[in-house]
Every structure is written in C-alpha cells, then in structure tokens.
C-alpha cells in the first residue's frame, strides 16, 4: 500500500484515532488528516467538566505535535473540504485545491442543533461542542451568575454540576418529563435528579419555552406553564445536527447521518465513515443506530482503519460510555432500555450497580462509583447470552 493515499475528513476523536490505527497496523502509504477547526485533535469529554472548573487546565490533545511528524501523518488544520467526487476519487478543498485518494474516511462529527428563539437574543447565549465553545463558556460562567440550561441530557447535566461548583445559580429546563431520557434507565434518572436538586439545581421538566426576551442585561424565558425564569446566561443543548451534507451531495446514502455497514463502509466502496456523523445498521434488528460517544468514535475509527486496509476488524464490544457529575462517576454499558432493572448496593451512598435484564438475560449495566467492576461488566455483556435466572441482586 506504499503508493496509496488515504484521506480523512474531520480531525476529531474518530479521525485522529483512525490515522493512528492505520500506522499501528503498518499502513505505509500517505495519510492526510483534514480538520475544519484551528486546533489539533483534542479530547472533548473534559470540556464540560475539568476544563471549565480549572482556569489553568490546558486542552488535552489526543497526540503531541511530534506524533504526527513521527508517524508521517499530514495534519491540515483550519481547512475545509467543500466537495467529494467519488467517480474521480478526489476531494475539493474550499480554496479550490484538489486531493486524490485511494480510500476516504469521513469523520466530520456533528454541530449543536440551533435554537433560533434563543439565538435571536444575541449575547450570552452559548452551546458546547468545541474547544472554542468551552473557552467562551470559561469566561462566562462565574460565581453568582444565574445560568439557565436548556436541555437535560448528559452535557446539560454536566454543565449544571460544573456551573454550581463554580458558584453559579442554575436552572435546568427540559422538554421531556425526565432527565437523560435517551441514555439512562429510570432508576438512574431519578437518582441523578435527586442529587442535582440536593445541590440546589432547580428543574422545570415536561416544559417548553414559548417566549424569550432580553430586558436590559437580563434574559427572560416564558414557559408554557406561564412561569417566568430570569437568567444572566443561557446554555442550550437540544441535540445535534450531523454533518452529512458533504456525503449527501456526493450521492452517498444518508438518513440523518451517513449510513454505514458493520465495516464502516458507505454506499461507495472506497468511502468509509466513523463517529457521530454515522448511522450503523444493527446486525440483529436491521435498525439504524447512532451512538454519540467517545468510545463509539474510537471503536468505529479502529474498525474503519482495518477495513480500509482490507484487514479483519476487531470484534466490537457492548456500547459503553460514562459521565461525571458532582464527583460521582457513572459508567453505562449495554442496553439502557432494558425491561427490568435491579439494584446491587446502595444508591444513597453513591455506590451501586444497576443490572438491566430482558427475559432473565443480562443486557445492560450501570456502575455508580464502581469503576473497578466495569471491566468485568463489559466482558460479561460482550456475550449477549448470559442467563441470570436466580441471581440475588440485593
């Protein structure tokens, strides 16, 4: 493969890990890694936590500058690909330049879904997806500020905890009647809601914003309940818009994301995709699934790199992710939509394991401040046929 060129569009977690994996697997052709941001690839999980809390915290880059030089990875930051031409095996840069590829990997990720009702307020409206976003938030979140967080997902709750730790007064507004509804079982939702409320976070659940106004320096939201909430800053996280337009324009199959198979291959044989931008077909159900997690970006990057080289990909494990809120580490593995959940340990002491089962089969688990147990749980859930009939949970 010495004379081949592999191009990776998107220099985030998946893109950088794919480039590293290609070199690890002895790919000796050219690798070009193109990123829109003016930063080398960096870790995103810390942006809603340590990076905001500690003003001295530096960005955590995935690899050093020397790494890209030593591995002969051509990292091009601050560049944008404007077109893919599959029939000619080339990409067109925004400046008009063209680059030919033998294999192409798309890892463009996602952007924050916009909320025009809030955006029209102008200043002091924030989202969090990038390092630049985090740098702006770091300057805004201060002691005694009134912060309105719109969206009760993982990022919203992490920001709520972080903002409170910085001394701010925090209110969370969520359209659903629960928090973390897309990714957490009801037991965990209730547990986290209680912990946040104990720390002083105010919640408006099952609530919509019907009006948003700026009155002097204050931001005023009118809710469908008729209540009014006032803040100095609004941070919203209401989902993501996936950067699949480039692929759609090139004729690739998309469906609110780039559709890939188990090898991360798109509808074009020499084009692959990985990370948040993808929808992958589940082998058992045939359903298209998206997992917007750090672990999934790494896993798909590894699979895609192997597939691009014609190598057998590693076996995927059960999906896993984590969140840290109020000093509590919560790790989740497997299916969070299980029919039944069982508690082992004591939630009140912030140390427990939740086991999710369907038809007496273990399909998911949540470890609360039980990180040492997660390795075994991940191994256990890699085998979907573990029968748990007769297990004593308490």
UniProtKB/Swiss-Prot annotation:
Family, as annotated: Belongs to the bacterial ring-hydroxylating dioxygenase ferredoxin reductase family.
Metabolic or biological pathway: Aromatic compound metabolism; 3-phenylpropanoate degradation
Cofactors, names only: FAD
Keyword terms: Aromatic hydrocarbons catabolism, FAD, Flavoprotein, NAD, Oxidoreductase
Subunit: This dioxygenase system consists of four proteins: the two subunits of the hydroxylase component (HcaE and HcaF), a ferredoxin (HcaC) and a ferredoxin reductase (HcaD).
Function: Part of the multicomponent 3-phenylpropionate dioxygenase, that converts 3-phenylpropionic acid (PP) and cinnamic acid (CI) into 3-phenylpropionate-dihydrodiol (PP-dihydrodiol) and cinnamic acid-dihydrodiol (CI-dihydrodiol), respectively.
GO function term, MF aspect, one: oxidoreductase activity, acting on NAD(P)H
Amino-acid positions noted as binding FAD in the UniProt annotation, renumbered to this chain: 5-36
Gene3D superfamilies: 3.30.390.30, FAD/NAD(P)-binding domain (3.50.50.60)
Catalytic activity, EC: 1.18.1.3
Family annotation (InterPro entries): FAD-oxidoreductase/Apoptosis, FAD/NAD-bd_sf, FAD/NAD-binding_dom, FAD/NAD-linked_Rdtase_dimer_sf, HcaD, Reductase_C, Ring-hydroxylating_dioxygenase
Reactions listed under catalytic activity: 2 reduced [2Fe-2S]-[ferredoxin] + NAD(+) + H(+) = 2 oxidized [2Fe-2S]-[ferredoxin] + NADH
Protein name per the record: 3-phenylpropionate/cinnamic acid dioxygenase ferredoxin--NAD(+) reductase component
Record-linked SUPFAM superfamilies: FAD/NAD(P)-binding domain (SSF51905), FAD/NAD-linked reductases, dimerisation (C-terminal) domain (SSF55424)
Highest taxon in the source lineage: Bacteria
GO biological processes: 3-phenylpropionate catabolic process
Residues holding NAD(+): 146-174
GO cellular component: cytoplasm
Nucleotide-binding among keywords: no
